[in-house]
Amino acid sequence: MKKKLLILLTFACVACLSAVLLTGCSSSNEEAESSEDTSADISTLIVGFDNSYPPYGFMDENNEPTGFDLDLAAEVANRNGWELQLEAIDWDAKDALLNQDSINCIWNGFTMEGREDDYTFSEPYMLNEQVIVVKSDSGITDFAGLADKTVVTQVDSAALDVLEGDQAELAGTFAELQTLSDYNNAFMQLESGMVDAVACDLSIAQYQMSANEGTYTMLEEPLSSEHYAVGFKKG
């Protein structure tokens, strides 16, 4: 089923959204033709997402799941006559759920880089950056200003991977690098002064700055750049 979904997601996105969501399995004409033959075999697309990850996946004022990636998944499912099943998941349980086939894919601002050996990915559909957000009145304007400060990020996130990898030297200057289960709590702690900075995706930073105008600012230099793709079980 996974391979069929990968193939079908590719051509559905190209057709209805002009987003190149290629499968990574193959993009040949032969596979394009075979996707027409297999679409009837798939009835439900089960998408795992983090429901506290705006603007990609979150709960609206009516407690209904919404967000850019969920809208994209819904359009793909609609164009192919599939039922879409959205499963809010604990982010640190995503691998177990994927390997147990409780979900078909992870579609929620999911970074490819550094995870290529762990998942089968579609081709990337978005360029993203990891950034640092601080309070506007913090006086922190660059990476040097983070020395001896407490920085928080989401557990098992791309930002954490960067701070433990390519930017480990920078993280070594922090007083502490903390992790939380979601970014909503991270920004609540930043607003309350419990932490000094949040490391997160660019789009999350922009969302929080827009929703809390004047409260936060983003350091000019990014931690890293990366690509988003849909992740499937390896193999």
Label each PLM-derived region with a short phrase.
Residues L45, F68-D69, E116-Y125, Y216-E221, ...:
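A structural signal for short loop-to-beta-strand junctions that line the ligand-binding cleft
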Residues M59, A73-W82, A159-L180, M209-E213:
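Ligand-binding cleft/hinge of the Venus flytrap
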Residues A74-R79, E87-A88, D92-C105, T120, ...:
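Short helices/loops that flank or line small-molecule/ion binding pockets
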